[in-house]
């Protein structure tokens, strides 16, 4: 019997990334995959939602940026305090922020085409770093993000960002013989 999967994400950039890149790959395993941005929802409502998802025997992935926490463990502790119904096994920590996952998927050829740096690692890339790298030809950061997603390379992203590699491996998102 298939279930439903809820991917809990912080904001709209996460919705865009998970909706375009991750949801289509997880959909065959579930009756439905829903992406739920939780940052603007009251804590109590998120807690009730997490509890109801578990009671209905559905699955969820709870995604959070590490931001400026010292470690994944520290970030998880903050989430445990904030959301009493959260299951630690369902937490995915993005290092550093979702923008680092976007940028990780840019191949050398695409970086050259866009006129941007081909970073060997995006593990320390912040939202501010990402914004500073947006080429002038794009009207907005959203346009730039859509352009990245058009040619996003899972293989490149798993090499350039450790937390993306860990996520992809854990949920068997992309089958790469090197992972």
PLM feature spans:
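C-terminal accessory helical subdomains adjacent to catalytic cores in phosphodiester-
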Residues: 1-2, 15-36, 44-61, 66-179
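Acidic donor-binding loop at a coil-to-helix junction in glycosyltransferase catalytic cores
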Residues: 9-13
């Amino acid at each position: 019997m298939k279930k439903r999967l809820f991917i809990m994400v912080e904001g709209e950039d996460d919705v865009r990334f998970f909706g375009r890149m991750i949801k289509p790959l997880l959909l065959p395993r579930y009756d439905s995959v829903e992406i739920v941005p939780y940052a603007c929802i009251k804590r109590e409502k998120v807690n009730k939602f997490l509890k109801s998802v578990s009671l209905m025997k559905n699955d969820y992935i709870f995604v959070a940026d590490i931001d400026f926490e010292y470690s994944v463990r520290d970030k998880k502790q903050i989430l445990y305090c904030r959301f009493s119904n959260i299951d630690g096994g369902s937490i995915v920590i993005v290092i550093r922020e979702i923008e680092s996952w976007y940028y990780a998927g840019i191949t050398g050829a695409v970086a050259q085409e866009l006129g941007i740096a081909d970073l060997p690692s995006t593990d320390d890339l912040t939202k501010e770093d990402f914004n500073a790298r947006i080429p002038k030809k794009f009207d907005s950061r959203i346009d730039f993000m859509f352009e990245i997603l058009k040619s996003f390379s899972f293989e490149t992203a798993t090499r350039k960002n450790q937390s993306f590699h860990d996520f992809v491996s854990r949920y068997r998102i992309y089958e790469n013989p090197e992972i």
